[in-house]
Amino acid sequence: MTKYFTSDTHFAHPFVAALRGYAKTGFTSDNTIRQQANEAHMQVKDCVNWYRHDMDVTDHINETVGPNDELYILGDLCSGSAWSLHHALIHIKSLRCPRNNRHLILGNHDDVLYGKSKGFKELTEAFGEIGRIGMTDITDGETIMTVFLCHFQWREDFDLPAVDGMASNWAKPELRRYAIPQVGESMRLLHGHTHADTPHEFRNRNEINVGLEAWNMRPVSEAELVRMFQEN
């Protein structure tokens, strides 16, 4: 059994799919996709191959995570709408990794984070564990490390200057309260949220971004994470 980690799957979230290169022919894959759709008198979801994006994300997970492995998704499963959640759960339930081996940490697009009950029952049918934050051990077979799990970067990172290539809401003040404060230098954190294309977008090397953009749109194994923490 191996633990795998990812974040920001954004199933059935056409805007994010566009940013990831899935705009249809005739449209540009960037953050102007809403404006492009408006000018074409279309909905964003009709301008983007979001279903191809979702199939690719699902296929990449199934190519990596087996039926005896554990999968941790650190938030932003979908856009947050009922339509998006419905499609997301279809993909989650198609994973080779069984329900009891799936863990969900809630992100800012997951309404349950804010105490809302909408969709919670459906989430419990697809995941064996759901929480705002978590903690688990990771190992490479020799070294064992304890890591915190949160959708968001360290709370202190919210005060840092903006970094190119990150989501516009990466340091949104109202999200700060959901982030974990780093109370000790030995604390290690796995997170997502920023959509950065590198696992180390912040100076603090005791946190690793497991978001899809940082890992070529695939989950990352616990052994690889242990190696990275040891290098830093």
Please provide the spans of the model-predicted regions.
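Core catalytic region of metal-dependent phosphoesterases/phosphodiesterases
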Residues: 2, 11, 15-138
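Active-site neighborhood of phospho(di)ester-bond hydrolases with catalytic His/Asp-centered motifs
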Residues: 6-7, 71-76, 102-108, 149-150, ...
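Active-site environment of divalent metal-dependent phosphoester hydrolases
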Residues: 10-17, 78-82, 108-116, 155-158, ...
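Conserved beta-sheet core of the metallophosphoesterase superfamily
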Residues: 125-232
